[in-house]
Amino acid sequence: MSDIMSNFSWLYGKPVATGKLKQLPEHFIVKEILGFEFTGNGEHLMVKIRKTGENTKYVANELAKFCGVKSKNVSWAGLKDRHAVTEQWLSVQVANSDELNFAKFEATHPGVEILEVTRHNKKLRPGDLQGNQFQVIATEVTDIDDVLARLEKVKLAGVPNYFGSQRFGHEGNNVNEARRWGRDNVRTRDNSKRSFYLSAARSWIFNHIVSQRITEGYFSQPVDGDILLDRNDRIVNENVTSEESIQKIQNGELSITAALAGDNQLPTTGTALTLEQPHLDAEPDLMALIRGNRMRHERRAIELHPENLTWSAEGDTLTLNFSLTSGSFATVIVRELLQEIEVERTYSSND
């Protein structure tokens, strides 16, 4: 199977080490961080789940049936990996929950535990997710000393804030479908599928821009015409190549950004524009899809710094612990450390 991420540059060079990820679900543990408290009352039942080997949408649909509501009445802040142990909240719009016995739900769904139940006055939305805590265990790791040396670099300078391979689908099928939709001017009422392919299209172009900056030596070095963001994701208007700006970038106060393509003109100028525009021009079908859906241009930081990064190694097993903000991918951190050996998995039909 081809690795779709091999299209993009490594910040620290292609790893020499190899290893296996998610050999077992408990080798990839994710805990959601919402960043706010629930009111304790309201029309939405908030259910905290721990799921193993199940995807979020399947559990949400099953929970809707159990609560006697439609699937559209169950929502979440973020979708979580299937082949993992993940904790997250689901909100269920249901008036009366006194008769619900969640022990019965657990008995018929062995891959799901109900950890906590409360109420809130609003349903969960994707924007509610602040981030996630991760524990990632890699097994059968070779060249462990090289991995440990790379971890020191990651802790100091971060990794490229690439979108992970899951955004692009199996062997890039989501990107290929997005191209077809743009080329054939496909129209649909399926907002979920439309959003899916638009995200793949914009992510693909973004990754290529970041990859070129690495290749040309501009990953942590601003160029004229760059657009910077502060820690609150606000655009900062200042001399981006000044010593002061460079120092703030190194301190993490400011971030260099790359384009999430839209139907409006790129706001970058000068050298920054020459690093971005060719990648939009190289994908006319993806841009046709983006423009046809009137997506507006956005910016995304090109560097990703995992918070509270710690690690331990025992034999050929590596354990990583870290937190990431919403929208970032744990797999792009591991990508800088080792080449993943594919693990064959068998799934049930709960897709």
UniProtKB/Swiss-Prot annotation:
Entry-linked InterPro entries: PsdUridine_synth_cat_dom_sf, PsdUridine_synth_TruD, PsdUridine_synth_TruD_CS, PsdUridine_synth_TruD_insert, TruD_catalytic, TruD_insert_sf, TruD_pseudoU_synthase
Origin superkingdom: Bacteria
Residues of the active site: 81
EC category name: isomerase
Family membership noted in the UniProt record: Belongs to the pseudouridine synthase TruD family.
NCBIfam families (alphabetical): PRK00984.1-4 (NF002155)
Protein name: tRNA pseudouridine synthase D
Taxon lineage: Bacteria, Pseudomonadati, Pseudomonadota, Gammaproteobacteria, Vibrionales
